[in-house]
Amino acid sequence: MLLIIDNTIEGVGSSPREIRSALERIDPGVRIVTERFENISPEHVKVLGPSHIFLSGQSHPWHRYNPSELAGVFHVIHHAPQPVLGVCGGQQQIALAYGARVDLIERIGPGEGYEGALRERGYCSVDLQTTNGIFGGLPETITVWESHCDEVKNLPPDFVQTATNETSHIQAMQHTSRPVFGVQFHPELFDEEHPHGRTILENFLKL
């Protein structure tokens, strides 16, 4: 069974549904459970017993989230024995759990929140700094879907950077001793012309 942790507020945002859809395309018979982030606790995850855990993107800037409601997910990020993959805002959530900073890529106009912020969006090139692990079997430069205004500003302790591009420096990272991975892009939004995201998900599911 696969667990998707839904990081959206009030169900705004399509990331959890898109991750589920991609996983069902890869394995039509797979069992998937989606749980709201505020309902996550170590005990609940232990009862569910997933083989892999996915952290979805978020729908609002992280400062609008109640820290107490994120505590359960942070505990899972730090201690879960299962492989964990944070997608887009899920990578940022991993960074926050380990004390790193998340902020806008750049502000290019007036406004508050995401208004006036630089957004990386569309199929973009990302340069891999490793072709092992979840990036096994891929070329040194991949094409994946991006849609974000925030980014991880500094690597958390015990993490290494595994991908980059010119717009947003930390495009992927992984823990040095635990199976915890983050990608700033959306591997679930793959198609026949852009298959690299599918390979990433397939590699993760083999861990």
Predicted segments with their positions:
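Cofactor-binding loop segments of dinucleotide-utilizing enzymes, especially the Rossmann-like FAD-
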Residues: I5-N7, F37, G89
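Pocket-forming structural segment of enzyme catalytic cores
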Residues: P83-L85, L96-P195
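Short beta-strand segments
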Residues: I4-D6, T34, E146-S147, Q184
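Glycine-rich nucleotide phosphate-binding loop and flanking beta-alpha elements
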Residues: G11, H60-W62, Q91, V152-K153, ...
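Alpha-helical elements of Rossmann-like donor-binding domains used by nucleotide-donor carbohydrate transfer enzymes
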Residues: E18, G72-H75, V160, T199-N203
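Flexible gly/pro-rich beta->alpha loop and the following alpha-helix that scaffold active-site loops
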Residues: R20-G86, Y98
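Short, charged N-terminal beta->alpha structural module
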Residues: L2-D27
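Acyltransferase
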Residues: T8-G11, V183-L207
